[in-house]
Amino acid sequence: GPNDLAATLNVPLGMNNQHPKHVEAVNKVLEAGKKHNIPTGIHCGSPEEVVERIEQGFLWMPLMSEVALMKTSFMASMKQINEKSKPSELKSDGKFY
């Protein structure tokens, strides 16, 4: 995946890596796949990156890992709850019952 490639190239890790060496290597893989009629894919870190990779010509784009998807969904849910419930205004005596 992208992080394995980044580690091999000795460049910073991260999804949608824009380091010039990483971009060049990803493009090289994509072009080799097209040349030999082999579907190419790349692991993506966001829906926006999936769209970008489709436009680039990739045919297989898994979106995040299961853990990352769960974390992203959880964080969005908690943000919505916190915005609507104003938890700083909640009072508690510390007892469950």
Task: Put a short name on every predicted segment.
Residues 2-97:
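Expand to "…catalyze enediolate/carbanion chemistry for C-C bond making/breaking, isomerization
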